[in-house]
Amino acid sequence: FAYLRIFKFHSLQKSKNIKFVDKYKNKIEYKIIPLQSVGIYVPSNLPSTLLMCAVPAQIAKVKKIVVANSRINGKLNPAVMYAAKKCGVSEVITCGGAQAIGNLAYIQNVNKIVGPGSDYVTKAKQLVFGKVGTESMVAGPSEILVLADKNTDINQIGTSMVSQSEHGYESQSILVTKYKEIIDKVQKNILYNLRNLPRKKIVLKSLKKHGLIILCKNDKQIIEVINECAPEHLEVNLSNHKKYLSKIFNAGSICIGPYTPMASTDYGLPGNNHTLPTMGSAKFSSGLNLNEYYKKISYVTLTKTGIDKLGKYVKYLSDFEGLEGHSISIKSRMRRK
């Protein structure tokens, strides 16, 4: 189910080649070329993350897909292996952490590494950038910001914060509201939902380190807080959400209304990607998408008439910049008059 939803949504992201021809028959083509190889980091043996990272690579027709996935008690996760086969993965290496990033970059020698991870994994990807490419974002520990008011279902707020915090100790969960009366109710609800949770200790430690409730004075302050936090996941669980959405510019993904919990996007129910910008990088980057698996090359063909008619403009600019060699190169192609 998740595979099909992710495949369908990401297939819609395909771009087209561009071709431009001017009146002198000079031609520029801008072609989309799949990367030759991609390395995918799968944290905590999560098949959902493998699907999010490998399905777009499959659609883009990347030739070689290498997955780094650590073992659990000495064994490979069958769900991850099934997802790998479904997505056409070429090879699986059994290691995790920063060392997996090193393996993908220097031993597997892939063109690009994608996939979220811990602070160590994030730093490792920054260190190997230049030798290989990485996503155009910081894909670190998970984050959620829930925007709620006095009419929002308290249990929906609490369960969303708990579900985000169970990812790990470094996960961040924030509630933003201007209604003081709901704060105590949310705190009690979180404790209630933790009673029988298997990862209770992780959630408690995560909330202690990175849990936050921000009480705002007005709507203007709410917008400022959200855009400054630039959260990975934003839940806008309000009846009057439209007045906020047009002013929110910084978020990895936005879940709108009471029936769209962040957890649904983590498992591909809608079909959008869950590898999203963290640590404020949503201010300048987007979530993982099909374009991450392509590069684009310009193919330029000038005609004799074209360079004769237009070459003088290059000469003017190159002479102005003091790059006479450029001017000579242009003149050598032009018809002498």
State each model region's role.
Residues F1-K14:
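Long amphipathic alpha-helix in the N-terminal Rossmann-like dinucleotide-binding domain
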Residues S15-F20, S171-V176, N196-L207, N237-L238, ...:
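Flexible, glycine/charged-enriched surface loops at secondary-structure junctions
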